[in-house]
Amino acid sequence: MRQHVNPLSSFFQLPLELPPPEQLFRVPDQPIHLDIGCARGRCLLGLAERDPHWNHLGVEIRRPLVTSADRDALASEHGNVRILFCNANISLEGWMKALKQDQLQRVSIQFPDPWFKRRHRKRRVLQPALLLAIATALQPGRELFLQSDVLNVIEPMVALTELSACFDRPVEDQRHWRASNPLSVPTERERYVLKQNLPVYRVLYRRNQNPLPSVSDLEQRWQEIDNPAEALTT
């Protein structure tokens, strides 16, 4: 069973300066796929083998998983995958901002820790500031992929993403949930869930050309939907 960590604890609030692509990848100018909450990184390691012309970066808040995952990444054949420890909501914005234009071309959040209770809203991985940082880094047409096996986990992510108005579903993919994974390698969790014949809820978005809302405005509108009683008192 996956052990949760509280991202709001003081230890995880310390910002970390993540290395630039030049220090991470053998060919640093290749397009980057960023996987937020990559666990042991098995999906990314498989993608790196299949897609050597992409660089793949996973970030994970559980340090014991990162130690072994990045050891495997460093041993990969193509030098195009790394797994780093950080709190995505604290350390990723500056790293994405420093990238070359259109270097980040895909972001995925797959099976995040299920902080689905409303009082734990601020522990969820996809927060307004992080979503807008992703939207800033992605050029129009670039992808954001979300999936979970817990409906109460993915629905708030979908609500937040669509409230931002920065992303659209592909024209050919207007169904509520995608039937298939657009990535060619499933995560460990996805394999387990599908083996149990349980549902997986997936949504693929592409960055549109809309301007970004302010973080405070997006936070307020998200709170009004996700926790109306709290919104009335703030």
Curated annotation (Swiss-Prot):
Tell me which EC number(s) this protein carries: 2.1.1.33
So where does substrate get bound? K117, D149
What does the UniProt keyword field contain? Methyltransferase, S-adenosyl-L-methionine, Transferase, tRNA processing
The residues listed in the UniProt record as binding S-adenosyl-L-methionine, with positions renumbered to this chain, are D35, E60, N87, D113
Q: Which SUPFAM superfamilies match?
A: S-adenosyl-L-methionine-dependent methyltransferases
Its cellular-component GO annotations read: tRNA methyltransferase complex
Q: Which PROSITE patterns match?
A: SAM_MT_TRMB
Report the superkingdom from the record: Bacteria
InterPro entries according to UniProt? SAM-dependent_MTases_sf, tRNA_(Gua-N-7)_MeTrfase_Trmb, tRNA_methyltr_TrmB_bact
Q: Does the keyword Zinc apply?
A: no
The pathway it acts in is: tRNA modification; N(7)-methylguanine-tRNA biosynthesis
Active site annotation, chain numbering: D113
| Catalytic activity field | guanosine(46) in tRNA + S-adenosyl-L-methionine = N(7)-methylguanosine(46) in tRNA + S-adenosyl-L-homocysteine
Q: In Gene Ontology terms, what is one molecular function of this protein?
A: tRNA (guanine(46)-N7)-methyltransferase activity
Similarity section: Belongs to the class I-like SAM-binding methyltransferase superfamily. TrmB family.
Role according to the record: Catalyzes the formation of N(7)-methylguanine at position 46 (m7G46) in tRNA.
Protein name per Swiss-Prot or TrEMBL: tRNA (guanine-N(7)-)-methyltransferase
Mind giving the lineage of the organism this protein is from?
Bacteria, Bacillati, Cyanobacteriota, Cyanophyceae, Synechococcales
